[in-house]
């Protein structure tokens, strides 16, 4: 469940497996028609095979057996990737119709266009890129989303600000220089989608364009939904969200053990559904408060006045929100 069928003037259609097949303006009825029509074609394994744009131009993709994307074809150009485990290492472009006599690895054009991506060890956070023999450092926010890039001389060459869904609010410098959105997402300007390993994410829709392949095991009731709060959660595989500090949260983690404070039994914990406050003042006065997506101030407003002033409670809530 949870698929988006209408978004303002945009309408969406899906196949029997829940994959988005069309997105267009208008109702699709005879007099109204389908304007600015995007079409999506899927492989049997649930991976996106092709996107047909409103201008009729096609974008095609290929993958390896692990779901890692190997190529993106658009017009006369093919973009290819080599991987280092779960992150891309090399990226380069080729002519779509190359000669069998060419050394497809060593043409001058490919050498100049080759990009090397470097990531934090055992993470999806990009820290640097090397292109045309020049190195650039990449700065990220608290979640690992790239925000700025600098050359070896310390000059800012790129910066970007995203909204909560991953849409670009502002971008300066070499636009598109760093294509990564949230952790594990590579944005394709040709389609407006972000490749997220096992699914594609749409910033405009604020959701995935196919259902979670692991269904409710992904811990989100909306099978198309991204994480509930992009300020501290991410989903690098398109399967299940992670805390940016501690990875997967499968079991309940107690931040503030149950104790009596001003005649209230209170406990603060984090589980697979996010941070919670358990508040109990006796029979029929028990509350479970999900504070996912709240600020510390908003979470404190959910409590009685006498508890808001307790420093231990405020500190526990802050730690839970930033877990």
Where does each model-flagged region fall?
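A motif-centric feature for acidic-aromatic and gly/ser/thr-rich catalytic loops and repeats
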Residues: 128, 132-197, 204, 228-233
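Catalytic toxin/effector domains delivered as secreted proteins or via bacterial secretion systems
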Residues: 240-323
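Short, solvent-exposed linear patches
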Residues: 219-222
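A structural motif specific to WD40 beta-propellers
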Residues: 209-211
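Acidic/glycine-rich beta-solenoid
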Residues: 1-136, 155-157, 163, 171-179
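Hydrophobic alpha-helical segments, especially N-terminal targeting/anchoring helices
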Residues: 14, 42, 52, 63, ...
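Short amphipathic beta-strand/extended segments with alternating polar/hydrophobic composition
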Residues: 15, 62, 81-84, 99-107, ...
């Amino acid at each position: 469940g949870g698929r988006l069928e209408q978004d303002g003037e945009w309408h969406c259609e899906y196949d029997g497996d829940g994959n988005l097949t069309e997105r267009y303006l208008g109702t699709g009825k005879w007099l109204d028609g389908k304007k600015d029509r995007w079409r999506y074609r899927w492989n049997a394994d649930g991976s996106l095979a092709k996107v047909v744009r409103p201008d009729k131009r096609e974008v095609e993709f290929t993958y390896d057996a692990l779901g890692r994307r190997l190529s993106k074809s658009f017009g006369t150009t093919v973009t290819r990737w080599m991987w280092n485990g779960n992150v891309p290492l090399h990226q380069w472009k080729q002519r779509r119709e190359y000669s069998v006599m060419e050394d497809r690895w060593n043409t001058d054009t490919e050498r100049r266009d080759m990009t090397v991506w470097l990531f934090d060890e055992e993470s999806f956070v990009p820290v640097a890129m090397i292109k045309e023999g020049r190195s650039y450092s990449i700065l990220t926010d608290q979640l690992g989303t790239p925000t700025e890039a600098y050359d070896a001389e310390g000059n800012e060459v790129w910066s970007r600000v995203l909204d909560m869904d991953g849409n670009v609010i502002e971008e300066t410098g070499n636009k598109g220089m760093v294509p990564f959105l949230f952790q594990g997402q590579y944005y394709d300007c040709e389609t407006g989608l972000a490749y997220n390993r096992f699914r594609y994410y749409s910033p405009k829709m604020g959701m995935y364009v196919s259902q979670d392949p692991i269904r409710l095991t992904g811990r989100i009731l909306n099978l198309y939904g991204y994480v509930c709060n992009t300020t501290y959660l991410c989903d690098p595989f398109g399967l299940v969200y992670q805390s940016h500090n501690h990875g997967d949260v499968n079991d309940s983690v107690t931040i503030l053990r149950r104790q009596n404070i001003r005649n209230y039994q209170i406990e603060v914990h984090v589980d697979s559904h996010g941070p919670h406050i358990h508040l109990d003042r006796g029979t029929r006065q028990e509350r479970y408060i999900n504070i996912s997506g709240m600020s510390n101030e908003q979470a404190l407003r959910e409590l009685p006045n006498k508890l808001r002033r307790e420093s231990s409670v405020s500190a526990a809530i802050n730690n839970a929100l930033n877990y």
